[in-house]
Amino acid sequence: MRKYEIMYIIAPNLEESANKEIIERYNKVLTDNGAEILKVDEIGKKRLAYEINDFKDGFYVLLSVQANTEAINEFNRLIKINDNVIRVLVTKDEQ
């Protein structure tokens, strides 16, 4: 298993409870597929560098996980379907 860093941005027009639900849902997708979540950092609402889908702000979430490729692929597949997640980036952590 490799270490990955995942950052995704949730649309700012959602309630805090909806944000928590999205975070828990995608953490569960990872753990159900054999990943180990090392760290969850809810950075919070920040200004975007440029507008994405007419949003100027977004709720940032940063994950550090140890996972296999299948777990990451399933996470990517499911998170890209969700319209409330406006951007996602998965990178390998080489450390």
Swiss-Prot record:
The lineage of its organism: Bacteria, Bacillati, Bacillota, Bacilli, Bacillales. One of its GO terms (molecular function) is structural constituent of ribosome. InterPro entries: Ribosomal_bS6, Ribosomal_bS6_CS, Ribosomal_bS6_sf, Ribosomal_S6_plastid/chlpt, Transl_elong_EF1B/ribsomal_bS6. SUPFAM superfamilies: Ribosomal protein S6 (SSF54995). Signal peptide: none annotated. One of its GO terms (cellular component) is cytoplasm. This is Small ribosomal subunit protein bS6. Belongs to the bacterial ribosomal protein bS6 family. The keyword GTP-binding does not apply. Pfam families: Ribosomal_S6 (PF01250). It comes from Shouchella clausii (strain KSM-K16). It comes from the Bacteria. Binds together with bS18 to 16S ribosomal RNA. PROSITE patterns: RIBOSOMAL_S6 (PS01048). One of its GO terms (biological process) is translation. The gene is rpsF.
